[in-house]
Swiss-Prot record:
Gene Ontology terms, MF aspect: 3-deoxy-manno-octulosonate cytidylyltransferase activity
Protein name from the UniProt record: 3-deoxy-manno-octulosonate cytidylyltransferase
Organism: Rhodospirillum centenum (strain ATCC 51521 / SW)
Catalytic activity: 3-deoxy-alpha-D-manno-oct-2-ulosonate + CTP = CMP-3-deoxy-beta-D-manno-octulosonate + diphosphate
Family that this chain belongs to: Belongs to the KdsB family.
Keywords: Cytoplasm, Lipopolysaccharide biosynthesis, Nucleotidyltransferase, Transferase
Principal subcellular localisation of the protein: cytoplasm
Keyword Transferase appears in the UniProt entry: yes
HAMAP family: KdsB
Pfam families named in the record: CTP_transf_3
InterPro entries registered for this protein in UniProt: Cytidylyl_trans, KdsB, Nucleotide-diphossugar_trans
Length: 257
């Protein structure tokens, strides 16, 4: 039986080349770059050290100014997972960290409890990867292809289960809840090493969902159910919402946009 991971490393991948909101890791939120706020949230989770895997020197400089640790990675990486793995290998070549938590760099309002929640299911024997989902409550999201659905084998009353599929379609069919997948991941270290070495899968290319590569290879993904979906900053409007949520005058930081 594989022992439960006990020493996670949090890695935040970040790059400037975003099509809808260029330079978004450096976007100003109340006098600080967005990446500094993400760094704060990851530190507040208090489950392990935090590293930012940067594609650009400007991001590394911003992280250093915020008192964080940054690693410059190959800007040509095809995915955030590849960037995360390079950072892991560089900061921990001896393999002291037995798990890796990937926190996306565009989640400045993420609840630190969500970061802790995604790490928890790795304790279950046989789990390679863990991620999060929340029940869809907005009717329009059920048919929105930009809202990725997690199809989860979930016992009645359970708060975590096993992923059967991820899709942009409305699934599963029939009565019952649908779950909005949240792109936060925790990996056993050996699972991340295996994942980045795999070739893209046919369904991954069709759905444009990287996590399907793991399912196609027979890897087990656990899904923890949380109450809310964090605000991902992809547009100028999202940025304004993040600024409102992080306004120091209100003192509030809700996880739900």
């Amino acid at each position: 039986m594989t022992a439960a991971p006990r020493n996670p490393l949090i890695v935040i991948p970040a790059r400037l080349a975003a099509s809808r909101l260029p330079d978004k890791p450096l976007a100003d939120i109340h006098g600080r770059p967005m990446i500094a706020h993400v760094l704060d949230r990851a530190r507040e989770a208090d489950i392990g050290p935090v590293v930012v895997a940067c594609a650009d020197a400007a991001i590394a400089d911003a992280v250093a100014a915020a008192g964080g640790r940054a690693v410059l990675t190959d800007p040509a990486h095809p995915s955030g997972s590849d960037r995360v793995w390079e950072a892991v290998c560089r900061v921990d070549p001896d393999g002291r960290h037995d798990a890796v938590v990937n926190v996306q760099g565009d989640l400045p309002t993420i609840d630190p409890a969500a970061v802790r929640a995604v790490f928890g299911p790795l304790a279950r024997p046989g789990t390679d990867i863990a991620t999060l989902a929340a029940e869809i409550v907005r009717v329009e999201e059920r048919t929105d292809p930009n809202v990725v659905k997690a199809v989860v084998e979930l016992a009645p009353g359970a708060r975590d289960g096993r992923a059967l599929y991820f899709t942009r379609a409305t699934a599963p069919w029939g009565e019952g809840p649908l779950f909005h997948h949240i792109g936060l991941y925790a990996y056993r270290r050996e699972a991340l090493a295996r994942f980045v070495a795999l070739p893209p899968a046919a369904l991954e290319r069709r759905e444009k969902l990287e996590q399907l590569r793991a399912l196609a290879a027979g890897m087990t993904i656990a899904v923890a159910i949380v109450d809310t979906v964090p605000l991902g900053v992809d547009t100028a409007a999202d940025l304004e919402r993040a600024r409102a949520l992080l306004d120091p005058r209100t003192g509030a930081r809700p996880a739900l946009p």
